[in-house]
Every structure is written in C-alpha cells, then in structure tokens.
C-alpha cells in the first residue's frame, strides 16, 4: 500500500497534502533516510506526522510489557538500566512527533484522539501529596511508593509516560525527548516539527550556566576555576560532579528522615532540587564534551557553556529513528540547514502555498531602521507608528511582535489602554492568549515570543505588527563566532523568525490578516536574500 493510503481516518487529504505524502513516500522508498520538507502554514503538516505513524508497526508485546511493568526502568547495583539491552533488541515501531512548545503538543492531541503526549514532570501534580509537582514528589525518597504509584496507575506523569512510550503516535517536545533514557526511544519514524528551530533547541539542551553563588557554597572561588584553559576546565567539571554528587546523597539521607515535615520552603528541599538538576546538567555537558567545541563565557555572576556547533549533537535525536522527517514553514537555504545538523544525504521537498497572498498582504517601511545603538532614541517614534496602525484597526484583534523585552516594557509604560495585553510582569504567553480569546473587546497581544506555536486564526488576529528585526545578540560569544565564520547563517536566523512571525495570523485558506513591518532593516535583508526565501512569502509583499 502507498503511504497516502494511511492518511488519518475521518479526514480528506487536500491536493497539496497528497503531493507532499507521495514525495515523502518516494524519497523513503528510494534510499533516503532523511527528508527535509518546507511547507507553508496551513498546508497540514501535522497530517504528515499522523500518516507516518499510521504506516508504522505497533510496539512488540515484549516491549509493551517491559514499559508497563516498569522493568524497562529498573537499575542494577551500578545504576545502569538492567533491561536496556532487552528493550534495544525489540524492533522499531511507531512514530514520535517532536515539537518546540507544549502548546504545539496540545495542537496534536486536540487534532488526533489517538495521539498521546508526554510533558515534563513539573506539568503534573502529585496525587499522593498535591502540594508538590511530580518533579519533587515523595517518591523521590521512597522507591516502593514510586513503584506502587506506577503499577497502580496513580500518577498522571507515569501514566502519560507509559502510554506515550507504547503508543504508535507519541508527541513530545524536544527537551522531553532528549531527557528520556536511550533504550526506550527507538522508532520507525522521528518527525522533527518546526525543524528550523532544531539548532536552537540543541544549543539550549546542551548549554549550561554555573552561578558563582552556587559554586561558592560548594567551596569554589572564581579564581579557583580555570575558565581560560579549556582542558583544565574539563578536569574541573569532573571534580565538580563528584562534589555535587556527594551533596545530593547527603541531602537524600536528611530528607528521607524528615519527609513528612518538609515543605517546598525547606532549605534542604530547595538545595536538593537545585543540586539534583545541576548534577544532571553538568553530566550531560561532560558526556558530550568531545562531540562539540564549547564556548566558555565568564562574567561577574556566572560561567556559561554553549556548544559552538550542533552537527555532532543532532545524533541524540536522529539515531533513534529509522527514517527522519524534518518539516517547517521556514527552511531557508536547505543545504546550509542540513550541514548545520550534520545531515549528509537527504531529499529536499518544497511546496507552494495555496493561500491567496491578497488575503495576507505585508506592508513595509524602508527608511525607519532600528538597531542596538539607536533603539532608545527611536522608541517614541516606534510607539507612535504602532498606535497609528492599532487605531486604524480599532475594531479588530491583533498582535505585536516586539522581539525584545525592552520594547515590550517601553510600550507598556507609555500606552495606557486596556486593549493591549502585555507579556510582562510575570505573565506568560498562554495567560494573555487566553484573555485575548475570551475577551469580546478588540484586544491586542504584545509579546517578544509569539513567533512559534501560536495559532491566531480568523478573528484572533486581523492584523499584526513586526516591530523590529529579530537579529540574534552579537554580545553572545557563540553567536559572534558563528557570525564571523558565516554571515549568511546570521541573516538566515533572522529571516526564519520573520517568516514564522508573519504566519501567526494566517492559518487557513480563507483567513485574512494584514502584516506591517516597521523596521527598514528587515526590508533590506529581504531584498538581499530574496532568492533563497519561499516564493509564497515573497508574493505577500506590497
């Protein structure tokens, strides 16, 4: 049977989806293990993931038993998973769809009833003690309690883990996937959704911040740490792991004795949580030290470690899939994209948008240009331009992509209008989006971080404003190094974010949303890089 025959039941494949699925099928059947797919917003990329999962096999009965019985997670006296080899010997099955946000996970599970989703432990409340999330539940100090909760399906987190690891279609964010034990992750298909952000996700996962205040508690002064010597710093990290490990073991003994009387405010509880997380993070860094060149930065407050490149880190995702599909609405310069991720042989597939560009026009300015040096001076003019547009669209909802917290804060301080919903003062995107959805007023979302995973369809956004080019900060040593090596990489990052932002308000074929770009720097960059930008995107410019 052809891959298209496994299109989800209850849905009808659109011509564009049929084309994509047929081309993916052909690529996988002609020797390609990697397919890079560039398909615009509204092309139904989620259905590609579900079609692949439908095409895959079910989990073997033995693998299912190993997961459901908890045997897959039992460790021996040395701390190694005792049944890891048995799990790894089971055949690959099913598909994992990996996303960048929890809201994108929710979109999958809302669309497909048989999809299962697993999120981090802090998203689940402990059923034994509701005062805690699962990431610090009583079972951390009581293995018998933990096993009881798992085997009796008491804990929502462990139920979600069980179901997601045995289901044909599991949906996880990249962070969750990377934190799972290796022996339970083998699949027929790994689908990397929003793959244009995969480099960022890998850098985030393998970066570390070591705060001097914490290091001081462990007996280290800044002068004791060899940040200028790469080899000696690696040796020092090994010493740090040993010291933190001893602290964790000592705290376990203390907390196991006073668990009933401990609270989240308890100093020992806080230290345990801090050191446990720090230990896991540093171990991840040292385990991958040889695979990537780390950029080490030090300031008065902390030491930051970031991998310069991710071409050798992508294996922590790719090695678990027999076939890999990477898909995004914004694959800019696919050859460079593949090189960054260490992909040598792949099939590139791109389809045009079926949306009418007249329904989603983009208007730009040319002479008003923002940069780090002139931003403060030009903020008043930027605010005035934003207000003019918002007043013109006074009866409809919209969104303002600010790019920086500085711009967001300035607008909040200088606009006294309840119509504007700011992501500031501890607010998160999910909170202001919910208010936006529930309000009958023509509210406007104002946030620096709604580029991805936000579905503002129909009346939720009839206009949107891009306030500033989202160039990455050159004060970051990693970014500065890569910029010097490859200026095109730097420009591509900004253009990728731009295209994603411009797609937040146009979600269906008949949807309408006008976009205003207020930074002439963006206009210049689009003109310079027009040849490598998607045609459907360029058609929107007026």
Located regions from the model:
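Conserved helicase motor "Helicase C" RecA-like lobe of SF1/SF2 P-loop NTPases
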Residues: 398-427
